[in-house]
């Protein structure tokens, strides 16, 4: 479930962003953006020149210099506004999270058990290792692990999902988040963080951008922009002596205008906004990224490790067939399977009971009246079943039943082995049923592949992304499901060690790997992966190991995360292409205007037939400022994303943003020149 999206130009955010844009005019703020810092210096210099001209200290057109100076300041303000608006949108999203944080009191237990004496203390004084009791109606005061009890918890304040979730001690559902509310029962929680370090605190800090650092690609692009700026600065500086030697020295105001129009101010002014907006779009998808680096890495990912259950398949395996062993009637197998599943409350267990009822009209028997002993499933035995009327019936995995049969002096039939392989090849999971030491047959549990998932994997393949299915199933079952789903590869009988080894193998080949996880056993692999999306419903260890947290706890979200990352990289690349292409048109506007008096041959470059040198220069400067404003929506929303190959994507962007970057300034500068001329402003 995604959070409510803010309007792109929310009035309150726009007003606040305008105020912040003015505050950012101070040199300390401008220094962080070298390209815009040059524009800021140029604005200051031309302001001083226009004042000197107006007071008669310097000769020249004071009105023209003032107009150039004013539009240069507007350029800086627009760049500041773009960044402030992006930050403001993120802070508005963070404010909704701040509403969750409430100064409250907690019941700190003196002993780690329910019923122990408790002290009432402020929640912000709780330390790591403290034990607290929370009951129905209480707000959980800290992040922690449930060590006793079980309760229904409302996590909507964090996740946006209204349906309550169960949190209980033991297993992968013991992690709780501060700021969520207990709906029923009680929990004894051990705090896992100190004040200011909670998940909510980290979310707020990350969303507000307080911890935002430039990503490697952003740093590389900044270095390129600085290099271009230095080249244009040196080139512009050499033009004054050339013009002076020609007998008609160009004014400093014109040279500053030329420099500002030639350096890549468009992308320089929008670069920070693109980075902030990328993290904001992640939050819009209910994913919290720990840094811009994580979002950027998502765009570069070329291997996706996807859990089978819940991501590729629906995750609710259903009994589809009873396959009896040689000499056993199918009805006898169905009867034994139903008995063994009467106390099994899992979806698989209930589906076995229902299938037996549908196939052979075997009505579900009253559990209480059977006077039977039910044997629950355990990770060690990997079986469950029932002891009734001297009958010992079990169902479980092939290996577990084989060990059970051999331990009871029996023999595992070869025909059942063949039936197990047959079920596995069809992409189903085989469960074997045994009574005493006699194997009765196989139950086929069919997991349904999600609709449309094969097409999504085909799109990812077009983009050069390899998909790998991770499953605990045997190789035959895994191979069948992998073929049906259309993944490129699979890892069967996966263990935490196997997942970690696979990630390292791909990284050794120079690939970037993304994966999801929710359990403590996923933590090593999450820590190793380049993009690690931890489920919010998972353990604290998993969330700390990942560099993103999915508040919806939806493993399929990994594909969307990659799309958002790629969209951010595409936006940055597209606007850089557009910005650099812009310079060509501005060159044709300003160079003839500035130097035609000295070198008349340059009039041949005035292909736009602009009205006068002053109108040409002023039109280029105005366009240079306005284009930043027009591109703010694109920087915040991101460019249109389509799953294409790298070469096709490059061609598409060159046509749209390269050619567009050439044509738009020619049209824009000419229109502005006509308006200035018609209005008599030049």
Swiss-Prot record:
Query: Which species is this UniProt entry from?
Result: Escherichia coli O127:H6 (strain E2348/69 / EPEC)
Pfam families named among the record's database cross-references: E1-E2_ATPase, Hydrolase
Enzyme class at the top of the EC tree: translocase
Q: What is this protein called?
A: Potassium-transporting ATPase ATP-binding subunit
Q: Which residues bind ATP?
A: 344, 348, 377-384, 395
Its domain of life reads Bacteria
What is the purpose of this protein?
Part of the high-affinity ATP-driven potassium transport (or Kdp) system, which catalyzes the hydrolysis of ATP coupled with the electrogenic transport of potassium into the cytoplasm. This subunit is responsible for energy coupling to the transport system and for the release of the potassium ions to the cytoplasm.
Give the Gene3D superfamilies listed for this entry: Calcium-transporting ATPase, cytoplasmic domain N (3.40.1110.10), Calcium-transporting ATPase, cytoplasmic transduction domain A (2.70.150.10), HAD superfamily/HAD-like (3.40.50.1000)
Gene name per UniProt = kdpB
User: Where is the protein found, in the record's own terms?
Assistant: Cell inner membrane
SUPFAM superfamilies recorded: Calcium ATPase, transduction domain A, Calcium ATPase, transmembrane domain M, HAD-like, Metal cation-transporting ATPase, ATP-binding domain N
EC number of this enzyme: 7.2.2.6
Residues annotated as binding Mg(2+) are: 518, 522
Oligomeric state and partners? The system is composed of three essential subunits: KdpA, KdpB and KdpC.
Q: Which reaction does it catalyse?
A: K(+)(out) + ATP + H2O = K(+)(in) + ADP + phosphate + H(+)
Return the PANTHER family for the record: POTASSIUM-TRANSPORTING ATPASE ATP-BINDING SUBUNIT
Family classification: Belongs to the cation transport ATPase (P-type) (TC 3.A.3) family. Type IA subfamily.
The record's Gene Ontology cellular component field reads: plasma membrane
Which InterPro entries does its entry note?
ATPase_P-typ_cyto_dom_N, ATPase_P-typ_P_site, ATPase_P-typ_TM_dom_sf, ATPase_P-typ_transduc_dom_A_sf, HAD-like_sf, HAD_sf, P-type_ATPase_bsu_IA, P_typ_ATPase
Q: Where are the transmembrane segments?
A: 34-54, 62-82, 219-239, 254-274, 588-608, 616-636, 656-676
Q: Name one GO molecular function term.
A: magnesium ion binding
* Keyword Nucleotide-binding among UniProt keywords: yes
Q: Locate the active site.
A: 307 (4-aspartylphosphate intermediate)
The protein's UniProt keywords, in alphabetical order, are: ATP-binding, Cell inner membrane, Cell membrane, Ion transport, Magnesium, Membrane, Metal-binding, Nucleotide-binding, Phosphoprotein, Potassium, Potassium transport, Translocase, Transmembrane, Transmembrane helix, Transport
| Membrane topology reported for the UniProt record | Multi-pass membrane protein
């Amino acid at each position: 479930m995604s959070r409510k999206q803010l309007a792109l130009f929310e009035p309150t955010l726009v007003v606040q962003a305008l105020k912040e844009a003015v505050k950012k005019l101070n040199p300390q703020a401008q220094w962080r953006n070298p390209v815009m810092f040059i524009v800021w210096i140029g604005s200051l210099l031309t302001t001083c020149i226009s004042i000197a001209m107006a007071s008669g200290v310097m000769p020249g057109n004071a009105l023209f210099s003032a107009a150039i100076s004013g539009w240069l300041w507007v350029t800086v303000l627009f760049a500041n506004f773009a960044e402030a608006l992006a930050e403001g949108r993120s802070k508005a999203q963070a404010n909704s999270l701040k509403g969750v944080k409430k100064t409250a009191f907690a019941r700190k237990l003196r002993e780690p058990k329910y019923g122990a004496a408790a002290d009432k203390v402020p929640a912000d004084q709780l330390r790591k290792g403290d034990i607290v009791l929370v009951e129905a109606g209480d707000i959980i005061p800290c992040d922690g692990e449930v060590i006793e009890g079980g309760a229904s918890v409302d996590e909507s304040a964090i996740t946006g999902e209204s349906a309550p979730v169960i949190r209980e001690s033991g297993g992968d559902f013991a992690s709780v988040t501060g700021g969520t509310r207990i709906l029923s029962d009680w929990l004894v929680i051990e705090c896992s963080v100190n004040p200011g370090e909670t998940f909510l605190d980290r979310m707020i800090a990350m969303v507000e951008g307080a911890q935002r650092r430039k990503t490697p690609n952003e740093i590389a692009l900044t270095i390129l922009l600085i290099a271009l700026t230095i080249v244009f600065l040196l080139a512009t500086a050499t033009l004054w002596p050339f013009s002076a030697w020609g007998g008609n020295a160009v004014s400093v105001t014109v040279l500053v205008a030329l420099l500002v129009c030639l350096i890549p101010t468009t992308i320089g002014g929008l670069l920070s906004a693109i980075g902030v907006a990328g993290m904001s779009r992640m939050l819009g998808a209910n994913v919290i990224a720990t840094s811009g680096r994580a979002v950027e890495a998502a765009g570069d990912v070329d291997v996706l490790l996807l859990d089978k259950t819940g991501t590729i398949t629906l995750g609710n395996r259903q009994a589809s067939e009873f396959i009896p062993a040689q000499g056993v009637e199918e009805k006898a197998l169905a009867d034994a399977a139903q008995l063994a599943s009467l106390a099994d409350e899992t979806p698989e267990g209930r589906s076995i009971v229902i299938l037996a009822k549908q196939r052979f009209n075997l009505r579900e028997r009253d559990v209480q009246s059977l006077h039977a002993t039910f044997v629950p499933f355990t990770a060690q035995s990997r079986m469950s079943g029932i002891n009734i009327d001297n009958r010992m019936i079990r169902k479980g995995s092939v290996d577990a039943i084989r060990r059970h049969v051999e331990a009871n002096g029996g023999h595992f039939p070869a025909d059942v082995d063949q039936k197990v392989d047959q079920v596995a090849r069809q992409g189903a999971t085989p469960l074997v049923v045994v009574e005493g030491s006699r194997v009765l047959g196989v139950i086929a549990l069919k997991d349904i592949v999600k609709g449309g998932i094969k097409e999504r994997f085909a799109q990812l393949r077009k983009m050069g992304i390899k998909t790998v299915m991770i499953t605990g199933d045997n190789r035959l079952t895994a191979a069948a499901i992998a073929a049906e789903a259309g993944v490129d590869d699979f890892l069967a009988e996966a263990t935490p060690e196997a997942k970690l080894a696979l990630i390292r193998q791909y990284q050794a080949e120079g690939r970037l790997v993304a994966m999801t996880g929710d359990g403590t056993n996923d933590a090593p692999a999450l820590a190793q992966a380049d993009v690690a999306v931890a489920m919010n419903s998972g353990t604290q260890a998993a969330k700390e190991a990942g560099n993103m947290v999915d508040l919806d706890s939806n493993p399929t979200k990994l594909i969307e995360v990659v799309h958002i990352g790629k969209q951010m990289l595409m936006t940055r690349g597209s606007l850089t292409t557009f910005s650099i292409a812009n310079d060509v048109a501005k060159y044709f506007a300003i160079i003839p205007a500035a130097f035609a008096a000295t070198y008349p041959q340059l009039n041949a470059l005035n292909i736009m037939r602009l009205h006068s040198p002053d109108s040409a220069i002023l039109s280029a400067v105005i366009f240079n400022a306005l284009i930043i404003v027009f591109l703010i929506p694109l920087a915040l929303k991101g460019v249109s994303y389509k799953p294409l190959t790298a070469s096709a994507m490059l061609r598409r962007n060159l046509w749209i943003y390269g050619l567009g970057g050439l044509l738009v300034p020619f049209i824009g500068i000419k229109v502005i020149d006509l308006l200035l001329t018609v209005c008599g402003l030049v």
